[in-house]
Amino acid sequence: MSTLGIRIRWRAATDCMAIDGIPRYAWGVPTKTYGQMCPLARSLDVLGERWTMLVIRELLLGPKRFKHLLAVLPAIGSNRLSERLRGLEQAQIIRKNTLPPPAAVAVYELTEEGERLRDPLIALGLWGLDLPVDDRIDPQTARAELVALCLAGTQTKLLDPGRGETVEFHVGDEVFHFQLRHGRFLPRSGPSPTDPTARIACDLQTFMDLALRELTPSQALKDGRATILAGSRSSLAEVFRVLAYNPQAPLPVHA
């Protein structure tokens, strides 16, 4: 964002102060606020409610229907999910859209403003990879596509900006794909809408072992833990050259 844009937003925020001194932002009025002009505090006014960032997390993987969001976040409940979606719409972080035929269903998707949260949330997810797992966490909630979402932004310097391809993964019951576009590796839920360059199958443990560098792609193929359903055998190594977790890698920052 330009310096002028930042100045305009700052002026808009200060011009919209309530009588009690609580800022009411022109691009979405939080129901709760820390009441501070600190940019981090103002960000938390919009994103700090429980479940909000997890809703955004799902939309980083592509547009989602209400029932899909409820299925992957069952503890949120339909009423609270509706509230969170409404708040994110008011903040212009998400919008409603209708998928083209033959689907022709209503979905929620990120706006350009919402897409700007990709790198900050990926950085937060990478930080979380090193945290100990609380005993109260249900291991059945583990999903390969969420790990892939966090890792996809860490090694983009290894990507050729001129390449354009799609790799589809079948990990247990999960199906997701990566779109390599303009030097970015973007994970998306569901099968690829076009014929993928490669299609790969493995179980969740194998995917995690590959991502955490506890298993090499060649060994996974040799042991039968991973299968190339379509495309070249080298595609598995290419994917995990980018996805493999490197705790020393700098956090993702993109223009």
PLM feature segments, named:
Residues 81-91:
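Basic amphipathic alpha-helical segments that dock to polyanions
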Residues 113-184, 233-255:
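Acidic, aliphatic-rich amphipathic alpha-helical segments
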Residues 48, 100-124:
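Basic, amphipathic "hinge/linker" alpha-helix immediately C-terminal to the N-terminal HTH DNA-binding motif
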Residues 193-255:
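C-terminal interaction segments
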Residues 179-181, 188-196:
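Non-DNA-binding regulatory cores of transcription-related proteins
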Residues 38-77:
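N-terminal helix-turn-helix DNA-binding core of bacterial DNA-binding proteins
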Residues 1-31:
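Short, intrinsically disordered or compositionally biased N-terminal tails of bacterial proteins
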